[in-house]
Structure formats: structure tokens, C-alpha cells
């Protein structure tokens, strides 16, 4: 990965959302790196056949990272060895930022920020045992209090290719007013490896503001992409205009991929995606209530066609075939 010639754009791993169908849709809008949903090392080791489905990738994904969590060195080592057998995976990202109590309270995710020596030891274990070219880590600014300097200095001893920094502590969770890009900038000054900024990047304007403040080598975007997967295309082209794509067709394509990947269960699983796509639209509440009752492919497809038929996202910006040509 060459960080000298462009700012890289990453899709953040989001549990329950960034599966293969969604990543396939987003990839068409110019995102450089996609990452799996977080997979626990324990699940990889003891339920590999089931868990490995989360690590499948689409033909479009040329830079695909498997994100794992864990705190026990022997289990992390074995999980890495499992991933080695998956030739389509390009690298391993280690989650040290998840704030969920069921993860952090057991010393995983952001819980590792309380023991930086152990965190670095686990990263060394990953690097020593992986056959993949890329190893990365995703962190927050601290657990209860901000310790950006300490984290940055510790990670300088870790064998990683880049560091993703979410600009909040674990205690901050996802509070908007807690985002701190200045601390990411501080870590960028200390770290001797590329830094990717993450957190509350929800527009083109915000993207370039964050790059200016942090001097980061790239951006990772998650929740904003759920409703507007074209945000990566907008950043690439430095425009607030929308690509000329019919939103209905985009949503239907995503739905069809969900059904193809999950079968009939994809109908129910797609409800949460529809909630995101419909956010801010007229009659969105009624639409959400409707789709929450649907379980059949035919009825769900009809509801999607009816609701999104009212809306055409158009502009004079080039079509799909010209996406992914520019870089920031």
C-alpha cells in the first residue's frame, strides 16, 4: 500500500452491516480498502466453518482486510493460522477499539487500551504468524481517559503497516461532541507509520477538514456510508453533487445480493439497511414499520420499489462507468 501518492479511503467495519453484500455495493463508489465485520479469534478457532462465511469477499474487493478481536495470545495465534488458509484475504486488522461491554469488559477491543504492552505483544504475535502482506490495528484515544501520546509511542514498537485512530475514548462511545481530531493529529506526529483518521466523517467538507486538521494519510468512514455509500465517490471527486444513479436500483441491487448471500434470512437481515437508506425521506417512519413485518422476498421487493420509486438521485456528474477515476 503506497500512502505517498494519494489519501486512501477505507470502509469501517460495522457489526451487522459491512458484510459481503454491502461491501460489494460500496466498492463501486471508489472505496480503496474494505474490512470484514469484526470476528472474534475465539469464534474463528472454535467455529471456523460458520465464522469463515463472514470473511468471504466479492470479486470487486481488491484490498480486503479481515478484522479480528481477542486478548489471549494462543487463541489469536491460532485464529491467524486459520486466516492464512483463506487466500482471498489480503491482510489482518486487529480491533482495539470496540466499545461494546461484552467485548471490552473481557479485555478485548478497547479493553486492550488498558494494557498497551499486551496490545503490542498481540500485534507481534499476529505479524509473526500471518502469511498476509498487511497487518494493521484500529484503536481509540484511550479507555476512560485520553492517552494518545502513550498509545502512539507504544504502537511505534508494533509491527503494523498502518494505524486507524477513532477520535474518541471508549467511555465517549459515539457521542458527537466528544470527537477529538487534535488528538489524532498528535498521534500522527508521533507515529512512524501511516495514520488513518476515523469518526464522524459524514460529508465531503468534513472529510477535507479532518485531513487538514490531522494530516492523516487516509480516512475511514462507517456509519455515513450506510445511508450514502456514494460518499467515497464524492470525496474522490471533491464534490457535493451526487452520482447519477437511481437510488431504487442501488437499494434493489443490495437487497438481491443479501438474498443471494443469506437466502430467505436476507429479507429480515436487510430491514436494518432499509432503515438507513430511508432515513430523512418522507414517510420513512411508515416505511420502516412496514418492512419490519415483511418476511418474503417478493413482498419486500415490492415495498422497496414502491417507496424508492419517488426518488431519483441525479446530477450532471458522470455515471457508474466513470466512478473511481480520481483520487484525493
Curated annotation (Swiss-Prot):
Enzyme class, first EC level, given as a word: oxidoreductase
Assigned keywords, A-Z: Flavoprotein, FMN, NADP, Oxidoreductase, RNA-binding, tRNA processing, tRNA-binding
Active site: residue positions: 98 (proton donor)
Pfam families, per database record: Dus (PF01207)
Ligand binding (FMN): 13-15, 67, 138, 198-200, 222-223
Single GO molecular function: flavin adenine dinucleotide binding
Recorded family membership: Belongs to the Dus family.
The name this protein goes by in its record: Probable tRNA-dihydrouridine synthase
Amino acid at each position: 500500500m503506497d500512502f505517498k501518492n494519494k489519501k486512501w479511503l477505507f470502509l469501517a467495519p460495522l457489526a451487522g452491516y459491512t458484510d459481503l453484500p454491502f461491501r460489494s455495493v460500496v466498492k463501486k463508489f471508489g472505496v480503496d480498502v474494505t474490512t470484514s465485520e469484526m470476528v472474534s479469534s475465539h469464534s474463528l478457532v472454535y467455529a471456523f466453518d460458520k465464522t469463515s462465511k463472514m470473511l468471504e469477499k466479492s470479486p470487486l474487493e481488491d484490498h480486503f482486510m479481515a478484522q479480528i478481536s481477542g486478548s489471549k495470545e494462543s487463541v489469536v495465534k491460532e485464529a491467524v493460522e486459520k486466516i492464512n488458509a483463506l487466500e482471498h484475504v489480503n491482510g489482518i486488522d486487529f480491533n482495539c477499539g470496540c466499545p461494546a461491554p461484552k467485548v471490552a469488559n473481557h479485555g478485548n477491543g478497547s479493553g486492550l487500551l488498558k494494557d498497551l504492552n499486551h496490545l503490542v505483544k498481540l500485534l507481534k504475535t499476529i505479524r509473526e504468524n500471518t502469511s498476509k502482506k498487511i497487518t494493521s490495528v484500529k484503536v481509540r484515544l484511550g479507555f476512560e481517559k485520553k492517552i494518545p501520546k502513550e498509545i502512539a509511542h507504544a504502537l511505534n514498537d508494533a509491527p503494523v503497516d498502518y494505524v486507524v485512530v477513532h477520535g474518541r475514548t471508549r467511555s465517549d462511545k459515539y457521542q458527537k461532541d466528544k470527537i477529538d481530531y487534535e488528538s489524532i493529529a498528535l498521534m500522527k506526529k508521533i507515529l512512524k507509520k501511516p495514520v488513518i483518521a476515523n469518526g464522524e466523517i459524514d460529508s465531503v467538507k468534513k472529510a477535507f477538514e479532518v485531513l487538514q486538521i490531522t494530516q492523516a494519510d487516509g480516512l475511514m468512514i462507517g456509519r455515513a456510508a450506510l445511508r450514502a455509500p456514494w460518499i467515497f465517490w464524492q470525496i474522490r471527486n471533491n464534490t457535493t453533487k451526487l452520482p447519477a444513479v437511481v437510488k431504487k436500483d442501488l437499494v434493489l441491487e443490495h437487497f438481491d445480493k443479501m438474498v443471494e448471500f443469506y437466502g430467505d434470512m436476507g429479507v429480515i437481515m436487510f430491514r436494518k439497511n432499509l432503515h438507513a437508506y430511508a432515513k430523512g425521506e418522507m414517510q420513512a417512519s411508515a416505511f420502516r414499520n412496514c418492512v419490519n413485518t415483511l418476511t418474503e422476498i417478493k413482498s419486500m421487493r415490492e415495498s422497496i420499489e414502491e417507496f424508492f420509486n419517488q426518488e431519483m438521485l441525479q446530477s450532471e456528474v458522470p455515471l457508474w462507468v466513470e466512478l473511481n477515476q480520481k483520487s484525493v
